[in-house]
Structures are given as C-alpha cells and as structure tokens.
C-alpha cells in the first residue's frame, strides 16, 4: 500500500484510466513531458488492467520527470474504481484532473448478434459508461476541492450513430449525455467537464474491439485512410482540458457531420455508411 506523499504547492495530480496503451498512454507521456520538469512537477496515476504495460508507461513518464502511481484497475468493477480513487488520495491527498479514457470498441451488425451473445452489450456499457460514472462519482469531492477538470473520451460514434456499432454507439451516446448534464451541475463548483470525440485513431483499440460473438474482431471495419495519429489525438484532448473547453470534436468531417445532422439527417446516415469497409456493410 503506497504511503501518503504531500504534493508540492505547484504539483498537480491527474488520474488517467485506460493508460496502458493507445490514447491514454500517449496523454500520460505528453503530460509528463509538459509538466515533469516544472517547479513541483506532476503526479500521474495510471490505471488499466495490465500491470506490465502500465509499468512500462510509468517508467517512460518517470524518465520525463513525472512522479507515477500505478493502480491495476478494471473499471467495469465499481469497487476497483473506488479503490483507484482511494489509493490516489492516500498517496497524494488531492486530485486535480480525472481523464476517463478506458474503453472497448465493437464492430457487429445487430442482426448478426445471437440472443445468447447479447450479454457483451451489457459488459461494453459497464466499461465505456459505468467505469467513467463510478470513477467520476468517487473522485468528485476531491475534484470540487481542487476546482479541477474532468475529461470524458467519447467518440464520433457518440454523436452520430454508426452502422455496425450499435453497442459502441449506445455506450458513447450515453457517455456524451451523462457528461453534458454533469457539466451544467458542476459549473458553479468550478469543475470543468471536457468531452472529446475522436474519430478513427491509429491505436490497437481498432483491432481489439469485439465482434458479434463478443470475441476480438481483429479489424475495425472502418476505412482508415484518414485515421489520426495517436500523438495528435492526445494533444487535442489535453489542449481541450487545459483550456477547459466543453467539447473537442476531432475531425473536419466530424464537425461537418454534426452540423448537417441537424438539418439533413439522411445525408449523415449515408456518410456514416460510407465510412464502413464494403465487406462489413449490411446487405
């Protein structure tokens, strides 16, 4: 059990879920690079299921001047979300930012999912929505005390329903709505809530998503010609957090699609269908 460590007056403490790879790991590296050498430095709490991968990220961030705490966490389990926050407070006594990044993708036509396999829809909701809800609820008193920041990494699939992503879109729409409502609740408390909407990003989540059977799909099913580098994606999310922005919509197509949806929803539905590879489109 880590011992309590008082942060220096200028040190900020950030929690990142899903920090073992992809966007979460890159945000950790960029935060360490930006603040690690500053007076007071930065404390990073890195959470995910893989202890080994988390430690590798922590080693890199430590080399950049950050102080790191690794907490192995499955965000689909409420008690582990609470333990993540408890360990952070025991170690540092404060939380300045919570980045809800942990998530699982999925690519499956709803008609191809058997009734006996629908349980993975519920599990996806536990990871993508409830993990963020539980972590945020546990951290909220400390974030209020620090007048800190909450980041929710949603998806363009949380703004526009994407064919083949009924489960994933459901979780991300729910996440979008939850944090939109929470933002209004926390305005007077001085806690910012930034929701990020990445499109296709070059990370392993593309191939680690679930198929109709709830098994690893091995492919995103999406065209990836315009996929964003993970470094750019992480930088845009962190910029939104620094500026305490309400939302960060990543791509030009995403911004355009969101606007067009209000006036011509059928056009956006065709755009979403055209984003799929031909072999995964409904016949």
Model-based region annotation:
Residues 20-21:
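Conserved glycine-rich cofactor-binding loop
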Residues 155:
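Residue(s) in the substrate-gating loop at a strand-loop-helix junction
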């Amino acid at each position: 059990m880590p011992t309590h460590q008082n942060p220096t007056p200028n040190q900020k403490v950030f929690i990142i879920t899903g920090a073992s790879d992809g966007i979460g790991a890159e945000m950790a590296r960029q935060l360490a690079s930006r603040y690690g050498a500053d007076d007071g430095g930065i404390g990073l709490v890195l959470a995910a299921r893989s202890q080994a991968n988390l430690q590798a990220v922590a080693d890199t961030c430590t080399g950049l001047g950050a102080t790191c705490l690794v907490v192995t966490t499955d965000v689909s389990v409420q008690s582990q979300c609470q333990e993540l926050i408890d360990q952070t407070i025991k170690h540092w006594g404060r939380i300045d930012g919570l980045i809800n990044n942990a998530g699982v993708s999925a690519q499956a036509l709803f008609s191809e999912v058997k009734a006996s396999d629908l349980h993975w829809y519920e599990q996806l909701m536990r990871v993508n929505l409830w993990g963020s809800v539980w972590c945020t609820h546990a951290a909220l008193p400390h974030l209020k005390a620090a007048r800190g920041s909450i980041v929710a990494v949603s998806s363009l699939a949380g703004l526009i329903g994407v064919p083949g992503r009924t489960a994933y879109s459901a979780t991300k729409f729910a996440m979008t709505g939850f944090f939109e409502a929470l933002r209004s609740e926390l305005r007077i408390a001085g806690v910012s809530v930034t929701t990020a909407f990445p499109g296709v990003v070059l990370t392993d989540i593309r191939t680690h998503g679930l198929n109709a059977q709830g098994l690893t799909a091995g492919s995103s099913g999406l065209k990836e010609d315009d996929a964003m580098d993970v470094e750019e994606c992480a930088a845009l999310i962190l910029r939104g957090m620094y500026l305490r922005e309400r939302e960060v919509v990543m791509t030009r197509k995403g911004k355009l699609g969101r606007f067009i949806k209000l006036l011509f929803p059928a056009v956006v539905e065709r755009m979403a269908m055209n984003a799929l590879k031909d072999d995964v489109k409904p016949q």
